[in-house]
């Protein structure tokens, strides 16, 4: 790997230098060829294993943990920071630079009495979801590898330590701006310094002046709306949408107790530590705006309030337009470039009625959408109909849907188009759990197989048909904890 060290050299007050503490008996548990190509790597090597496990120095790496704050479950925490993630620097790839971070690399000044370690189960989950989301077309950070060990760590019980090697276009979070805005640290010069760095690194077309800042914040609003629209369309619940888990670039970030929907449930809670459902699936769009409002509040020393408010007022429109585009594609609808506000509202109602029907009939979210690839839209009797209990309600919906769809001249091409946007394979929690159990028993085959299948989520893979099945009773709607 070849590194540049722009964050390290230009923002010395935004991190602490800290070196990883190695893990015993490191070994590869997972590796992503796709992610490796982003930074010019090919095959995993012993030298790379020693470096990324913290047991040897990586040439050109600087090693640091970033400091930030954030709103966690609605309450402000003035000092957070990377408690178990150590960044090596920005690795230069063929199409840009990516931060390389060792998640679970050992304690840092921000560990808050924690051990700085990650356990194998959380490392495997983060690896799988990072790569799964990418191949589903969702903006996300990436995962290069998981490195296992025989080092014991204690959570609810004894587990083994592991490291996820994360790649990110940037690790700058909403919480970075909050840290230097609130309390005694509130200094406009630090905010301006961070903002200018962000623009030069990631928005070089924008100028470092009030006009550029205004345009930048609007872009953050739009990118965040796009990310959350993808989550809602694909049926993904993040679980911990704290402001310190929000990427400034609109990439899905910092995965913990996430879940993809099994049975559709608007108020589904995937996080055992969220009994009130603040971050429930259906709450994510509203929380996205709330988090952006907190970012705007932190930016008031450097961006005019009127400009911040004007950008925030664009959030709902951006979210709806991205969501409509994704859901129209799932329904096989043709989207006119100049669709009217009236048509948008009618389509939102059509989509909303269908998801309500799914919830009332307790249907599997991904399976139901995938069925559109088998549908003959010209038929008066939908093959979907048999999945529903309330047939009158479904028939009424289907009649409106057919009218909106219009005549389909090439049914096979239409079905193929539906299959290109409605995945056959998703990372259900029970599949991840089965892979984790197998890894714990020393068997990597199940993890490797699941990873490979999730690289082609829209493609029929007959030999892996069982990975597309609905979850067994024990795996339905699994709720995970934040323990990692």
Swiss-Prot record:
TM region positions: none
Catalytic activity, as annotated: L-seryl-[protein] + ATP = 3-O-(5'-adenylyl)-L-seryl-[protein] + diphosphate; L-threonyl-[protein] + ATP = 3-O-(5'-adenylyl)-L-threonyl-[protein] + diphosphate; L-tyrosyl-[protein] + ATP = O-(5'-adenylyl)-L-tyrosyl-[protein] + diphosphate; L-histidyl-[protein] + UTP = N(tele)-(5'-uridylyl)-L-histidyl-[protein] + diphosphate
Active site: 244
Keyword Nucleotidyltransferase in annotation: yes
PANTHER family for this protein: PROTEIN ADENYLYLTRANSFERASE SELO, MITOCHONDRIAL (PTHR32057:SF14)
Family of the protein in this entry: Belongs to the SELO family.
Record NCBIfam families: PRK00029.1
Name the record gives this protein: Protein nucleotidyltransferase YdiU
Organism: Shewanella oneidensis (strain ATCC 700550 / JCM 31522 / CIP 106686 / LMG 19005 / NCIMB 14063 / MR-1)
Gene: ydiU
